[in-house]
Amino acid sequence: MSQRPNPSALIWLLLSAVVIGLDQWSKAWVLSSLPEYTPVPVIDGFWNWYRTYNTGAAFSFLSDAGGWQLWFFTALAVGISGLLAFWLSRTARGDWRSAVPYALVIGGAIGNVIDRLMHGHVVDFIQWYVGEHTWPSFNIADSAIVGGAIGIALFGLFDGKRSRKAG
C-alpha cells in the first residue's frame, strides 16, 4: 500500500483570493466614488480617503522611470507569487505560520498586478497623517503585502530561535 502524501498548504490560496477580492472591490468603489487627489476625512487629523495613482512600487519608487517599470514590477510580483505558491505546495496544511504570510503576499501582489494590467498603475486610496506628516497613500493589497512580509520575518525569526533551542 502506498502512503498518502501530507496535504499541502495550497488551500491557503483561498486567503489570497479573499485579499484579491477585497482589494479589487475596494478599488472599484474608489474609482466610482472618490474624487481624484481630494482628501475625504475618515478620522479627522489622522485618516483620509485620498484617490491617487502609483506607477512605481512602494513609496512610489521608480514612479517617474518612463514606463518600463510597469512590466518590471508586474514580472517581479508574478515571479514572487509563483515562488511563494511553490513554497506553499511544499508546506504542511497546518503550518499557518508559513502559509498565512505567504498567502497574504500572494494576494496583495496579484491585486496590484491586476491594477497595473487594467489601468497602467496601482490605485491607492488610504492616507494616514499626523499634522503635516503624511504617510504615502496605500491600498488593501499593500497592507496584505506588508502584513505578510512582517509575518514571514517574525515567524521565521521565532521559528529559528525555537529550532536552535531544540537542537
Curated annotation (Swiss-Prot):
The record, for InterPro entries, names:
Peptidase_A8
Q: Where in the cell is it found?
A: Cell inner membrane
The pathway noted for it is: Protein modification; lipoprotein biosynthesis (signal peptide cleavage)
Q: Which UniProt keywords apply?
A: Aspartyl protease, Cell inner membrane, Cell membrane, Hydrolase, Membrane, Protease, Transmembrane, Transmembrane helix
Which GO MF terms does the UniProt record name? Answer: aspartic-type endopeptidase activity; endopeptidase activity
Q: Name one GO biological process term.
A: proteolysis
PROSITE patterns hit by this protein: SPASE_II
Q: Per UniProt, what is the membrane topology?
A: Multi-pass membrane protein
Bilayer-crossing regions: 10-30, 68-88, 98-118, 138-158
Keyword Membrane found: yes
Q: Which reaction does it catalyse?
A: Release of signal peptides from bacterial membrane prolipoproteins. Hydrolyzes -Xaa-Yaa-Zaa-|-(S,diacylglyceryl)Cys-, in which Xaa is hydrophobic (preferably Leu), and Yaa (Ala or Ser) and Zaa (Gly or Ala) have small, neutral side chains
Alphabetized Pfam families for the sequence: Peptidase_A8
An annotated GO cellular component: plasma membrane
Q: What is its EC number?
A: 3.4.23.36
- Which residues does the entry assign to the active site, renumbered to this chain? 124, 142
Family according to the record: Belongs to the peptidase A8 family.
What PANTHER family does UniProt report for this protein, alphabetically? LIPOPROTEIN SIGNAL PEPTIDASE
**Role description:** This protein specifically catalyzes the removal of signal peptides from prolipoproteins.
The protein's name in its UniProt record: Lipoprotein signal peptidase
